Amino acid sequence: MMERSQILTERQQSELNKAIIQYLQPICSQENNEVLDKLTSMLKIESTELDGSDIVDNYLEKKWSTVLRLQKKIIDLENEIHNLTNIINTTNSETNGVVLSKDKINWIPKGASKQTYQCENVVATVRLHPNLPLVFNGCNDGNLYIWNLTNDDNTIPEKRIKAHTRSINKMCFSYRKPYYLATCSSDLTIKIWDEKFNHIRTLNGHEHTVSSVKFSPSDSNILYSVSRDKNIRVWDISQGVCLKSFVGHSEWCRDLDAVASETQGDFVLTCSNDQSARLSHINSGVGVAMFVGHTHVVESVKFLPKIQANELIDEYITKNIDQFPSIPSELLKDPIYDELGFKYCVSASRDNTIKLWLIPPPTLIPHRSPLPSKYNNSQGWLIAEFKGHSSWVKCLSVHPNGKFIISGSDDKTIKFWDLSGLIETGSVTAIKTISGHEGFINDIDFARLTDSESNTDKELTSEEYLKDVEKRMRCLFISGSADNSIKLWS
């Protein structure tokens, strides 16, 4: 006599027996009917039970496919748990990018490459995800790669997407969740990707290579772009439309940075083959300041944060005011800079130098758009020049502490510059040079601060601000090169 299963209930056992007979019925031929009848008897199934509707068609096959789907779901969930566990470890482990020492705020890579990710083509741009342990890079062949820092195998990307038909020149993430990704290309398009990295929008309008893109710091639905067609464009990515376009330079626009003002809206800093950088007010399209002094193409520009950098440079200028006779002494303490949200910027050029500028504040008139600065003929003041690279300086990044400037060059090196040198020696020199790439350095990225847990509008002191930065800082730094590789530096 057949023993009843100890795992299944009586009803489940009965359903299974019926499903077995149901599955075998169309398989068994006339000659095997005797075997089928004997099996039906052994399983204690009446023939009338199989004629009714108490068991669905193809019951056994459907159960089997359900089990397979559940097994796949379990594997996916186990992988997700593994990734989330690694993310937690990444947040709490020094070896995964977080330094627990008291000097974390001044962390820079020691110079050894922790991981190398190899692509099939020149790496043109790189970005770290704002929140997840993911590295993104765009290549000259139009491919977008996504690498997971927690994976043991660094030879296989998490994902590879044929994003564009020509080179991906730059990419950027929005500043708030959900984190949108924007990529721009020599195929004249900009593409928008959602938080799961699905393509959701293509922006058309530029008439030549799109060089760089940047999300508005104040609105994740607004994107800015610059192009070889000399135009600066403002996009609404939710609608996929261009809201504004204005000519920023007389030649190819190479790069841009954006900052949000408390009362005046956004400002963008752009640079060009015309050897200049320009500050523009987005809402009006008016150019309010120019930065002239480079002797070759200006490849990259960055605003400096209001912490540390401002204090160090202010102190240097104040102590050496005789070197800057055209800077009004009262200007450095003018509260207009607090309202604007910017004061200093840096630019990098093919003349092998980086220049530090004091930005002349635009003229503010109530109920009107900002006008060109009344100071210094709207020209930025050159405060310092960083010399040390032996070839074109292609890319810039600003350390979260605000006082380190990071540069990548065609001389295959990455340099870290300390603004403290202005106070100590009157000049800015490289405190660290790292090398390891075998080709030009095309892009670099220092991990963005994690989202703030505080919702307070309280004005922080410099010390409180630095403590908050240190708490939210991720010690991750990457570079992308013409040698087809991305390096994560430890």
UniProtKB/Swiss-Prot annotation:
Stretches assigned to coiled coil: 65-96
Organism superkingdom: Eukaryota
One protein family per Pfam: WD40
Cellular component GO terms held in the UniProt record: cytoplasm; microtubule; microtubule associated complex; spindle pole
WD repeats (start-end): 118-157, 163-204, 205-245, 251-290, 293-327, 328-367, 388-427, 436-487
Keyword terms of this UniProt record: Cell cycle, Cell division, Coiled coil, Cytoplasm, Cytoskeleton, Microtubule, Mitosis, Repeat, Transport, WD repeat
Gene Ontology MF term list: dynein complex binding
Localization (cell): Cytoplasm, Cytoskeleton; Cytoplasm, Cytoskeleton, Spindle pole
One GO term (biological process): establishment of mitotic spindle orientation
SMART domains for the chain: WD40
InterPro entries referenced in this protein's UniProt entry, alphabetically: Dynein_regulator_LIS1, G-protein_beta_WD-40_rep, LIS1_N, WD40/YVTN_repeat-like_dom_sf, WD40_repeat_CS, WD40_repeat_dom_sf, WD40_rpt, WD_LIS1/nudF_dynein_reg
Assembly behavior: Self-associates. Interacts with NDL1 and dynein.
HAMAP family named among the record's database cross-references: lis1
Summary of the function given for this chain in its UniProt record: Positively regulates the activity of the minus-end directed microtubule motor protein dynein. Plays a central role in positioning the mitotic spindle at the bud neck during cell division. Targets cytoplasmic dynein to microtubule plus ends, thereby promoting dynein-mediated microtubule sliding along the bud cortex and consequently the movement of the mitotic spindle to the bud neck.
UniProt family annotation: Belongs to the WD repeat LIS1/nudF family.
Protein name per the record: Nuclear distribution protein PAC1
Species annotation: Candida tropicalis (strain ATCC MYA-3404 / T1)
